[in-house]
Amino acid sequence: MKTGIHPEYVDTTVQCGCGHSFTTRSTKQSGTIVVEVCSQCHPFYTGKQKILDSGGRVARFEKRYGKRNKAAADK
């Protein structure tokens, strides 16, 4: 393996927009990474997630034309 070609691996502080910060290791030389969301404020991890059921093409079809019953489909 060649020496001197790999970037230096340094301790890095990750700062979130919510104020939470944690330390990890990275090759980023500044030593600081700023992110918008983290596991402390992301809705998926906090349990405040809104589930949007936009339906789909099948739901739209069933809404327009009604759901077919199985007996009619077998004929």
Curated annotation (Swiss-Prot):
Cofactor note text: Binds 1 zinc ion per subunit.
InterPro entries cross-referenced by the UniProt entry: Ribosomal_bL28/bL31-like_sf (IPR034704), Ribosomal_bL31 (IPR002150), Ribosomal_bL31_A (IPR027491), Ribosomal_bL31_sf (IPR042105)
UniProt binding sites for Zn(2+): 16, 18, 38, 41
An annotated GO cellular component: ribonucleoprotein complex
Swiss-Prot/TrEMBL GO biological process terms: translation
Keyword annotations of the record: Metal-binding, Ribonucleoprotein, Ribosomal protein, RNA-binding, rRNA-binding, Zinc
Disulfide bridge map: none
Domain of life per record: Bacteria
Essential cofactor(s): Zn(2+)
Any one GO molecular function term: metal ion binding
Quaternary structure and partners: Part of the 50S ribosomal subunit.
Function, in words: Binds the 23S rRNA.
Homology family: Belongs to the bacterial ribosomal protein bL31 family. Type A subfamily.
Protein name, UniProt field: Large ribosomal subunit protein bL31
Species: Mycolicibacterium smegmatis (strain ATCC 700084 / mc(2)155)
